From Swiss-Prot:
Residues annotated for L-tyrosine binding in this entry: Y37, Y170, Q174, D177, Q192
Gene3D superfamilies assigned to the protein according to its UniProt record, in alphabetical order: HUPs
Similarity annotation: Belongs to the class-I aminoacyl-tRNA synthetase family. TyrS type 4 subfamily.
One Pfam family of this chain: tRNA-synt_1b
Catalysed reactions listed for this entry: tRNA(Tyr) + L-tyrosine + ATP = L-tyrosyl-tRNA(Tyr) + AMP + diphosphate + H(+)
UniProt protein name: Tyrosine--tRNA ligase
GO CC, one annotated term: cytoplasm
The enzyme's E.C. designation: 6.1.1.1
Source species, domain of life: Archaea
Species assigned in the record: Nanoarchaeum equitans (strain Kin4-M)
Gene giving rise to this polypeptide: tyrS
Amino acid sequence: MDIEERINLIAQKPTEEILTIDRLKQYLEQGIDLNHYIGFEISGFVHLGTGIISMLKVRDFQKAKVKTTLFLADYHSWINKKLGGDLETIRKVAKGYFAEALKVSLKTVGGDPDEVKVVLGSELYEKLGIEYLENIIKISMNTTLNRIKKGITIMGRKQGESISFAQLLYVPMQVADIYSLNVNLAHGGIDQRKAHVIAIEVSDAFGYKPIAVHHHLLLGMHIDENIRQKLLEAKKTNNRELFEDSVIDIKMSKSKPETAIFIHDTPEDIRRKIRKAYCPIGEIELNPIIELVEYVIYPILKEPIVIENKKTHQTMEFDNVEQLKEAYAKKQIHPLDLKEYVAEKLIEILEPARKYFLEGKGNKYLEELKNLQITR
């Protein structure tokens, strides 16, 4: 595989941004091995954004001959009060349900779970000892309190929101994870951009400059026209601060279960959630149902998109997402017909994950998490 092919794999959807493409090319031309990581907070059930979108990108990295790592951030989750703020529970879920869910998701999208390294944060810190603390101090000495405060959006917190002092540690800890793992390719959703920019800015203290790759954040099913217009205005005026604050409200979130598709949802759950989802007729930008076709269904199935009109029983076939968008923008497709297609294809794609967690070996991990959520 040549350099151009590797770059194309890294840059293709769901990638939205590479910081920077020139540095990526330089590293590849120099024959530098790329060491990747993506970090995850440990909370509730894994949805399409966490499982499928993230793992689609990990799959691409694997194809591009990048060493991939999934980092289970138990201390970060504790700081951010996930799973009731119980560290023991967080670790149990991390090593059980969460690790399994990510591996199953990677396999579902065509990646190789046997070729990905899974690292628990606390185990890394125990191994590194004082070195990890030194990394945090180095980072803190090379950035400002104002930058750290602005970076709290990586935790799903809005700027100006009241936070604990521990939560201020979150950003330098995340940056320290990158250097502590010897990562030169940091990966995350576009909401993680601020931490990765700080990592690049403090790179002189560590002797090398990492690349950052940011993937698309999947919209939640609950977006409405008011939120949509706010986001469109932020994009139009290139107001990154407003956009990043708004993304917290509209991205698919496990804390709002009716707005998220989980990887082990039943067919009935998927159909119900898709049926209720926001899908404005003729609008293709910031439309969560269109996004599911563009970022989940088409990249995985790689097959023509066939939409059936339920009234006339006539079908329309599209070779790619752009053709579908064009027809939808012209109001040639009814939202209900598009929703029907999306629901059935998601049911098909998620069948392996659903069987693993509802009927197979993964059921014990799913039930364990359910019980922990009830008793905590």
